[in-house]
Amino acid sequence: MAIEGGERTCGVHELICIRKVSPEAVGFLSAVGVFIVLMLLLFLYINKKFCFENVGGFPDLGSGYNTRTNSQDKMYNSYMDRDEPGSSSESEDEALGKYHEALSRTHNSRWPLVDSRQKSYAWETRQKYSPLSAEYDGYSTEASMEDGNCIQRMRRTPPLDELQPPPYQDDSGSPHLSCTPSEIGDAKCEISHCSNSPRCSFNKCPSEGSTGHEAESYHNKGYEDDVPSDSTAVLSPEDMSAQGSSSQLPKPFDPEPEAKYGTLDVTFDYDSERQKLLVTVTAVTDIPTYNRTGGNSWQVHLVLLPIKKQRAKTSIQRGPCPVFTETFKFNHVESEMIGNYAVRFRLYGVHRMKKEKIVGEKIFYLTKLNLQGKMSLPVILEPSYNPSGCDSQVSLSEASCGDSTSSCQSLQHGSVPEILIGLLYNATTGRLSAEVIKGSHFKNLAANRPPNTYVKLTLLNSMGQEMSKCKTSTRRGQPNPVYKETFVFQVALFQLSDVTLILSVYNRRSMKRKEMIGWISLGLNSSGEEELRHWTAMKESKGQQVCRWHALLES
């Protein structure tokens, strides 16, 4: 039997063979295709991984400066190579002087008008710097003009601390700044005659006392090598005698330091007879950019510490330099106990349909207050997780937190990762509220940059079965993130002693699996005695929120 098909015929046994071979051929070709696709995906993954590993951090902000210096170094090396062999006995200063003469001739031939900043930089490369000189100030006051609606003000001084007495006025009416003997040689105290705000000129000192002023927040560490510091380099006495009088010292380029969290223009007026304190918030400058805050509306909150019963807040203003000019009154501020009072300033970014976000805060202790007359000064805000704003009289690990957004840090565990949790249980509604307030000392073990963290909450029953779970939003690039997110779980009163609440902190990574930073558990299977005491205090608080710091356990 044969089937006719065109010019040739096929037997039945040939068709049977073809039908048996076709599925195998199709399977083989399919396997080859899948293998090729997998190899292609693996190649793309490896290529993307190496691409991300080879990319550095931020671009070098001083690339133009480095290019300029490299070209000058090349010119210097070529100039030194052209010298005769007999000129090797010349001193280094003479060779360097010839190099600068040749460099100046080259610049004059190309650019007739040389910038004064480049001249001062070329002069400074020949000098030898020393840490401190008593004849020159480390800061220079210059008037700076921002945008059209910005306030013209003088160079901001470093924030006052307890070791620096407040400014006063003598009988003649001329303002002064009182300096203690320990400050002589470290700072020059003077007053600006064209402004009502005092200013102090500081020099960098290698002593231990100056480390507090030189310490910067982690946001500025990446720019220390590229941006010149806000201090004028001075010559040592040996170089001063060699170079001549101090009148020939040029002023180098001294840029305005960039404030990261805002600066408040505040006026304090204290009346000791009436025990009344008037605080006027004029304006806010040096506000972070829109990319960091995500908004353009601002509001300032004030609270009198440590009682926290007298509060005030400004109206909402828009723009990069909002102007408030609002005065607030705080009563019952005794002059005998004024050292125990402080005013906390907080700058909030107000977003439409969103929760307010803290931009920066500062606690101003009234020990620095002028008890007679008005005192105007800038208040430089700091990150809200800065432990320097803690009140020593308040212990969050022993008492419940009335203000869940308190900025105090628990320092009892050192650099161990910690988390601040607020618990509240309403027996009437059967709702368990857990507020994740903030974290501390979160580290990225895989890299040196700050981690991108979020907190996961899981509620388990007595059998270890999951009843509910939720998580916070991700805080990117913050070792001390502020969450302030509340989660509600439905738990009956008879079940409250049989449930376990687990909080896990994770570091979210783009190309890799998430990494657990630490965890704690509260309730039936508490991870420690501190967690068990927190859970017991919540049940006995009768509807009041209880906040405690907890050290995270390693995974």
UniProtKB/Swiss-Prot annotation:
Residues assigned to the Extracellular compartment are 1-24
Major localization class: membrane
- All copies of the C2 domain together span 260-379, 415-550
Which residues belong to the signal peptide in this entry? none
- Which GO terms of the cellular component aspect does the record hold? membrane
Ranges annotated as biased composition (Basic and acidic residues): 211-224
Q: What molecular function terms (GO) are annotated for this protein?
A: identical protein binding; phospholipid binding
Which InterPro entries does this UniProt record tie to the protein?
C2_dom, C2_domain_sf, SYT14/14L/16
Tissue expression: Expressed in heart and testis. Expressed in brain (especially in the cerebellum).
Q: How does it sit in the membrane?
A: Single-pass type III membrane protein
Localization in the cell: Membrane
Gene3D superfamilies named among the record's database cross-references:
C2 domain
State the protein's purpose: May be involved in the trafficking and exocytosis of secretory vesicles in non-neuronal tissues. Is Ca(2+)-independent.
Instruction: Give the matching PANTHER family.
Output: SYNAPTOTAGMIN 14, ISOFORM D, SYNAPTOTAGMIN-14-RELATED
Its protein name is Synaptotagmin-14
Organism of origin? Mus musculus (Mouse)
Q: Which gene encodes it?
A: Syt14
